[in-house]
């Protein structure tokens, strides 16, 4: 049997792989070495002709300045690495609440920097080869939707000077099936690092929706679970540390395709997920039903909001196994942080306090139209109350404010007589019109006697 695939042909000359020395694969096309040489000859002839006729060569464009990531902490000494308290203070300025999650991330990122500094010192001979090896500790963030898991990761990206990429686990499938290979996660990191492999190998990857790849049942199935357990198995070596082959164009790997090799040993992985139903598994294990954690009605039962966090803090690795994660994957994510659901007070703070708070964003937008926007405290509380009722966390806030501001944002740019717009509680609850204050010059003048 021939070692070549006779069905593969050059898209330009039509020769099969057996008839040429090299067949280069691209996204849906192939080109042989003979066609590449022909292209080079054509380009050389055109260059010779242009020089012979005295044509001016094209003016070289200056190379774009490299974009700087983070705060310039790349390859710092241990004394210059941002301390966990400094990292948390930065997170506090942009994310409200979630103290435990911030502390876990701050310590993990600080240790990641120290580990990179140690490895660089060891590589340069400044550290003893007999010293203790420092291993990375990947992180798992567990919390309901809209509580700030992804925002925490994205805020870290603004602070750090290592490449940072966010990936969605729901798009991944086992190799050989329709969907994305797990290596495409590394491709995103490589693209952020401007295709510099050394930089990418120092980066951090946040894998969102990790709970969506849980296997369908606790016991292994005889059928293929290509988007669940199969993906978990494919992630094992990547999380632990391996040399992965990444296709530079993305998509599925091809046997004749040139790939970029990336060592994942020094890449920090942060995984996040809602893990809906995990609290019920924990409750069944610790036997707290008689203490009022769960209200049971027939075959279905509902966990009280204020007790969910207490249950989740008692979670053990075996609970994650029952949820659908394989033990090998859990062992490679040793650090677990529970991100709390948001209450009304926290939602109010999210609306007004962060540097990029939603209220501040709309105030900035209307200021560009020379209008001062104000939110009454009762209006902010009413918005937070409605967002809490929708049970989608902070994501509901933007939807509610967008609904409130639609008519205002539509009318005000065309009006020059308005100086101030006030959002009231009645506007939030009854969808009434906003209170507008007109410029004194636009008010009707009193009639003279």
Curated annotation (Swiss-Prot):
GO terms for molecular function: ATP binding; ATP hydrolysis activity; ATP-dependent protein folding chaperone; protein dimerization activity; unfolded protein binding; zinc ion binding. InterPro entries: AAA+_ATPase, ATP-dep_Clp_protease_ClpX, ATPase_AAA_core, Clp_ATPase_C, Clp_protease_ATP-bd_su_ClpX, ClpX_bact, P-loop_NTPase, Znf_CppX_C4. Keywords: ATP-binding, Chaperone, Metal-binding, Nucleotide-binding, Zinc. PROSITE patterns: CLPX_ZB. ATP binds at residues 144-151. It comes from the Bacteria. The keyword Transmembrane does not apply. Pfam families: AAA_2, ClpB_D2-small, zf-C4_ClpX. Zn(2+) binds at residues 10, 13, 32, 35. Disulfide bonds: none annotated. Residues 51-76 are annotated as: Disordered. Residues 1-51 form the ClpX-type ZB domain. GO terms for biological process: cell division; proteolysis involved in protein catabolic process. GO terms for cellular component: HslUV protease complex. ATP-dependent specificity component of the Clp protease. It directs the protease to specific substrates. Can perform chaperone functions in the absence of ClpP. Component of the ClpX-ClpP complex. Forms a hexameric ring that, in the presence of ATP, binds to fourteen ClpP subunits assembled into a disk-like structure with a central cavity, resembling the structure of eukaryotic proteasomes. Belongs to the ClpX chaperone family. HAMAP family: ClpX. This is ATP-dependent Clp protease ATP-binding subunit ClpX. It comes from Trichodesmium erythraeum (strain IMS101).
């Amino acid at each position: 049997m021939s070692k070549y695939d006779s069905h593969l042909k050059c898209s330009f000359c039509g020769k099969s792989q057996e008839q040429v020395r090299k067949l280069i694969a691209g996204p849906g096309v192939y080109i042989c070495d003979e066609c590449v040489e022909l292209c080079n000859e054509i380009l050389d002839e055109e260059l010779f002709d242009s020089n012979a006729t005295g044509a001016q060569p094209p003016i070289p464009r200056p190379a774009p300045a490299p974009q700087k990531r983070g705060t310039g902490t790349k390859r710092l000494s241990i004394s210059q690495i941002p301390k966990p308290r400094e990292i948390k203070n930065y997170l506090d300025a942009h994310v409200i609440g979630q103290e435990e999650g911030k502390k876990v991330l701050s310590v993990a990122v600080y240790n990641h920097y120290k580990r990179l500094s140690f490895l660089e010192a060891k590589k340069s001979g400044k550290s003893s080869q007999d010293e203790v090896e420092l291993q990375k500790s990947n992180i798992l963030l567990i919390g309901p939707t809209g509580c700030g898991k992804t925002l925490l990761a994205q805020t870290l990206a603004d602070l750090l000077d290592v490449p940072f990429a966010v990936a969605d686990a729901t798009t991944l499938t086992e190799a050989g099936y329709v969907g994305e290979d797990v290596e495409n996660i590394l491709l995103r990191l490589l693209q952020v690092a401007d295709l510099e492999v050394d930089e990418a190998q120092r980066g951090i990857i946040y894998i969102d929706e990790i709970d969506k790849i849980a296997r369908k049942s606790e016991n292994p199935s005889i059928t293929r679970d290509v988007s669940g357990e199969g993906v978990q198995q494919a992630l094992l070596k990547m999380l632990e540390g391996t040399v992965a082959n990444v296709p530079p164009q993305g998509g599925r790997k091809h046997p004749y395709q040139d790939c970029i090799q990336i060592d994942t040993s020094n890449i920090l992985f942060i995984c996040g997920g809602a893990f809906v139903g995990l609290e019920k598994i924990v409750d069944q294990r610790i036997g707290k039903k008689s203490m009022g954690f769960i209200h049971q009605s027939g075959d279905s039962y509902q966990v009280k909001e204020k007790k969910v966090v207490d249950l989740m803090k008692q979670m053990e690795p075996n609970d994650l196994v029952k949820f659908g994660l394989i033990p090998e994957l859990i062992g490679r994510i040793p650090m677990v942080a529970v991100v709390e659901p948001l209450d009304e007070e926290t939602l109010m703070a999210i609306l007004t306090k962060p540097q990029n708070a939603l209220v501040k964003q709309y105030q900035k937008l209307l200021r560009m139209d020379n209008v001062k926007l104000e939110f009454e405290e009762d209006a902010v509380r009413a918005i937070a109350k409605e967002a809490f009722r929708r049970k989608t966390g902070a994501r509901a806030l933007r939807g509610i404010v967008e609904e409130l501001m639609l008519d205002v944002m539509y009318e005000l740019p065309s009006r020059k007589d308005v100086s101030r717009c006030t959002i009231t509680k009645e506007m939030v609850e009854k969808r009434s019109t906003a209170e507008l204050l007109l410029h004194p010059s636009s008010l009707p003048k009193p009639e003279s006697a």
